[in-house]
Design a protein with these regions (language model features):
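Bacterial N-terminal signal peptides
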Residues: 5-14
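Short, glycine-/small- and polar/acidic-enriched structural segments
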Residues: 22-155
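Sec/Tat signal peptide C-region and signal peptidase I cleavage site
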Residues: 15-19
Length: 155
């Protein structure tokens, strides 16, 4: 995580650092555990030591954070790489790119109750699954279903 904070600091330092530079950082989701390092850096004064005044804004999903950066409303943001790929597919030439991978193995999961008979991927057939439409992990479900011989028409 220390390397990640150093990286974010170096990106933020690319902005003029002679006076306190105000910069907005768009999160992909609400203030939760994964965003703790950013707040830690603020609380410990790491950004301030570099003359940066960082404001962190909560998001509503990766497909909320990415357009904020692409339109210039925010100079930097945090988002799921799968959502960025989807965004760039729908918006070719958009001026946004990934500069660092934070999670090389994201913790995507399907949670099911054993008491309801969900113990293997194929047990999902006949069940109802829910995910928000812009969810980057949900985009992974079709290949997951295919790899596990799940008939998505039965879900």
């Amino acid at each position: 995580m220390k390397i990640f904070l150093i990286f974010i600091t170096s990106v933020l330092l690319s902005f003029n650092s002679f006076a306190n530079t105000k910069i907005s950082f768009a999160l992909d989701w609400k203030f939760e555990g994964p965003s703790a390092p950013y707040f830690y850096a603020i609380d410990k004064g790491h950004f301030g030591e570099e003359n940066l005044e960082v404001e962190i804004s909560a998001g509503k999903g990766s497909l909320d954070a990415i357009p904020k950066v692409a339109t210039g409303a925010f100079p930097i943001g945090f988002a799921d790489i799968n959502s960025l790929i989807k965004f760039l597919d729908q918006n070719p030439g958009a001026p946004v790119m990934a500069v660092m991978m934070v999670y090389d193995k994201p913790p995507f999961a399907i949670a099911g109750r054993k008491s309801l008979g969900v113990t293997t991927p194929s047990d999902l057939e006949g069940k109802i699954l829910g995910a928000p439409p812009p969810d980057g992990a949900w985009a992974q479900f079709p290949p997951f279903a295919s790899a596990n011989n799940i008939n998505v028409d039965n879900i």
